[in-house]
A protein has these predicted regions:
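Accessory terminal and edge-of-domain segments that mediate assembly/interaction
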Residues: 1-108, 117-278
């Protein structure tokens, strides 16, 4: 047996503790009523957009979300009620919440993250619809056997989102990202290494979420707002106005509405303790 626990996870075995167990306890402890959650949910890792939506009266707390750790807000965009959860940063936290979203009835999870530039060919700021991620983190190893990369589990949906984002006039690319658990341990050697392998940006969630999506047959897409770079002398961390970020959500909604039947966002197989068609 390999002595590294992270490389020994029995990914083919059933979990003994499931989201359904936690959801039941949350509803009982917090007196949260039963009810469906939105089919399209956003994980908004920075949190500023959610704060602005709430302050503007565009989003409200969602009463049926069963979670000890987060608050879901409901926002209606182009006639579609969406869920948005802020600040679930990092692979473990993002996947913990994604598990509960899937168990509660979500059909598409979109992660919206800020990111750092790796490829010098990328303009700043720029959007990246993530097609795959380097697995330089730990969470994905609990869902899939060890490998260098993981692909987006919903590539057709990601393509639709890319087209809708391109239509709003902001710079947007499709490509790979490097997912890290330790942003303050990025080195120049690593940046050059991954740039040589056509990686566009670095962030903290995509590989973990993609591995979860593949393992649990859940549609997950990641959109990175690339806003900073160690070799950039201009404005750093500029993702545009919050109203422009709302346009990103609207583009995702249009893609969600346009998913053709042959692609579909069908009900995923029920986990132990879940209802089969929530």
């Amino acid at each position: 047996m390999n002595k590294l626990p992270l490389l020994n996870h029995p990914v083919a075995q059933q979990s003994v503790f499931t989201p359904a167990h936690l959801i039941k306890s949350v509803r009982r402890a917090r007196q949260i009523p039963e009810g469906p959650i939105p089919k399209l949910c956003f994980l908004e890792f920075d949190g500023d957009l959610t704060d602005w939506l709430v302050a503007e009266g565009l989003a409200r707390p969602f009463p049926f979300w069963p979670c000890f750790h987060t608050t879901m807000f409901a926002v209606e965009i182009e006639g579609v009620e969406c869920g948005i959860i802020p600040r679930t940063i990092g692979g473990p936290y993002a996947v913990l919440v994604a598990e509960q979203l899937a168990s509660s009835g979500a059909r598409l999870i979109v992660g919206l993250t800020s990111a750092g530039r790796v490829s010098r060919e990328l303009p700043l700021p720029c959007l990246v619809v993530v097609t795959g991620a380097i697995r330089d983190e730990g969470t994905s190893l609990h869902y899939l056997p060890a490998a260098k990369e993981v692909s987006c589990p919903a590539p057709a949906v990601a393509d639709l989102i890319f087209r809708e984002l391109a239509a709003i006039g902001r710079p947007v690319r499709q490509g790979k990202v490097w997912t890290t658990d330790a942003p303050y341990r990025e080195t120049q050697m690593q940046l050059e290494w991954w740039a040589a392998e056509s990686v566009l940006a670095v962030e903290m969630q995509a590989a973990s979420l993609f591995a979860f999506g593949i393992a649990k047959e859940m549609a997950v897409v990641s959109v990175a707002m690339v806003s900073n770079a160690v070799d950039h002398d201009g404005e750093q961390f500029d993702t545009g106005s919050l109203r422009e970020e709302l346009r990103i959500l609207a583009a995702c909604v249009r893609a969600f509405k346009g998913v053709p039947a042959e692609i579909g966002l069908a009900n995923r197989p029920a986990e132990p303790g879940e209802s089969p068609n929530i």
